[in-house]
Amino acid sequence: MVDFVLSVLRVAIPAGTPLLFGTLGEVYAERSGVLNLGIEGMMIMGAITGFGVTHATGNVWLGVVAAALVGGLLALLHAFTSVTLRVNQVVSGLGLTMLGLGLSGMLGKRYIGQPPAARLGAVTLPVLSDLPVLGSLFFRFDPLVYLAVILVPVLWFVLYKTRWGVTLRSVGENPAAADALGVNVVAVRYLAVFFGGVMAGLGGGHLSLAYTPAWIEGMTAGAGWIVIALTIFAMWDPARALVGAYLFGGVRVLQFRLQPLGISPNLLNMLPFILTILVLLLSAGETMRKRIGAPEALMQPYAREE
């Protein structure tokens, strides 16, 4: 039993890393008042772009950078439609998800079944990697796993302990008041949404370059939707996002580990989404949203009064 739990934990961390990247970015985007339902499209485009660039150049780090950039570019498109044009944020995000899924399928046809030109391998940390049990459990992962973990305290500190973090939160709570104090609401929202897209792209890149080093059409398998629920589960807090991402990562791992026990694979495939629906149901309603700390101006377009 102990071995089973340890084996699940060992895989849950890399499995949850794409979710962690996406959630950290979405926390910042929503803290600015912008909901991004295009995360799924940005992640899948990050996955195909990262794999394609790595395949073309043989340099996996160029693939990582390309994955992040394509996520950021798609996010800028979302920012333009939802912040500048003030289009409904749900419609804009859903459109980007459909665009990403369709475009990635078209671009990825040539890479189906192709072996990766390079991949992000595990990095061992001196002394720490040799620790009994803990060494293999926490200190033998690819570089993006460590980057995601390092970003958690950094982003928490920026959000709660810096002037820019206060500015970001004020824009998400009361953009009119922030504007009256001289804050450029549009610029802050653009930056937050762009950052969210970069993180989503990194999450997709991790999928195709490290966790499952290959291109598989639709390989995000709904990860972007889980990110939306995780953002609520984390109560828009980077530290809680770490716990939630690895929890959902463990649930996804259980899909495969429990199949030998005779449990229906269809039921197991539903597990992450059952949890997602439960989180969304628990957060439904204006009273509950306020209680769990949802940004007051989330999904509210802002037009400066002349």
Predicted features, each with a name:
Residues 22, 47-51, 101-105, 147-156, ...:
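Hydrophobic core segments of alpha-helical transmembrane domains in multi-pass membrane transport
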Residues 137-215, 238-243:
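Helix-loop-helix "hairpin" substructures at the membrane interface of multi-pass membrane proteins
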Residues 100-161, 263-268, 295-306:
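Transmembrane helix-bundle core of multi-pass membrane transporters
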Residues 89-91, 117-121, 140-147, 189, ...:
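Loop-to-transmembrane alpha-helix initiation sites
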Residues 29-35, 74-128, 161-163, 219-222, ...:
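Short loop segments and helix-boundary regions at transmembrane helix junctions
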Residues 7-56, 64, 69, 73-90, ...:
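Single transmembrane alpha-helix segments in multi-pass membrane proteins
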